[in-house]
From Swiss-Prot:
InterPro entries recorded: Med7/Med21-like, Mediatior_Med7, Mediatior_Med7_sf
Reported function: Component of the Mediator complex, a coactivator involved in the regulated transcription of nearly all RNA polymerase II-dependent genes. Mediator functions as a bridge to convey information from gene-specific regulatory proteins to the basal RNA polymerase II transcription machinery. Mediator is recruited to promoters by direct interactions with regulatory proteins and serves as a scaffold for the assembly of a functional preinitiation complex with RNA polymerase II and the general transcription factors.
Gene Ontology cellular component annotations, sorted alphabetically: core mediator complex; mediator complex
Family: Belongs to the Mediator complex subunit 7 family.
Organism annotation: Eremothecium gossypii (strain ATCC 10895 / CBS 109.51 / FGSC 9923 / NRRL Y-1056)
Keywords noted in UniProt: Activator, Nucleus, Transcription, Transcription regulation
GO function term, MF aspect, one: transcription coactivator activity
Protein name: Mediator of RNA polymerase II transcription subunit 7
Length: 199
């Protein structure tokens, strides 16, 4: 068997600096942090520096679990990815979601039309289908991009609906509690009247 067919371990081995996390080092850490002033938190001067967590990245990117992640999660433009933008989004950034919904409807109609055209091209001249398939692909990428731009609004609306449902549920519970309290008070008042009448 070749070395390339070997199964790698399910979990990666622990980093080498894990051996510095001993009980003695943890006890010395507070004293070390108070006496030692660091100008560069990335610089390692002794084994206790491994116990101090690195600063949270504020810009650019970072590496975690073998992947590179952007600090600010932004949706790239279609042009930067190398695709043609089929809708006009100049001046439409931000919270103009009605515009995005209208553009989605336009793209869906265009997709249906192109699917019909693809069927007709396949029935008449099957060799000409790659251009139509590429156009459908571009439309689908544009729809996908618009849907991704719409996700923050959808999340906010879903959260609002969830909170409104919880509020209605709490109001119903409070109304039920008040009704039960009224019944208990009426029952106690009736018992008091009966007790006074018996005396």
């Amino acid at each position: 068997m070749s070395d390339s067919n070997n199964i790698s371990s399910l979990y990666p081995p622990p980093p080498p600096y894990v051996k510095f996390f001993t009980k003695d080092n943890l006890e010395r850490l507070a004293e070390y942090q108070s006496s030692h002033v660091t100008t560069d938190p990335e610089q390692i001067t002794c084994e206790l520096d491994f116990l101090i967590p690195p600063p949270v990245p504020s810009a650019g990117h970072y590496r975690a679990f073998g992947s590179v992640w952007q600090v600010k999660d932004e949706l790239p433009d279609l042009e930067t990815v190398g695709l043609r933008n089929l809708y006009d989004d100049r001046g439409q950034h931000g919270n103009n979601y009605q515009y995005k919904i209208k553009e989605l409807h336009k793209l869906l109609k265009s997709l249906l039309l192109n699917m019909l055209e693809l069927v007709s091209v396949l029935s008449v001249n099957p060799e000409r289908f790659p251009d139509k398939v590429e156009h459908i692909r571009t439309i689908l990428f544009n729809i996908h991009h618009l849907l991704n731009e719409y996700r923050p609004h959808q999340s906010r609306e879903s959260l609002i609906m969830l909170l409104e449902e919880q509020l209605e549920h709490k109001k119903e519970e409070i109304a039920n509690i008040h009704a039960i309290c009224d019944k208990v008070q009426a029952k106690l008042a009736a018992m008091c009247k009966q007790y006074i009448a018996d005396d």
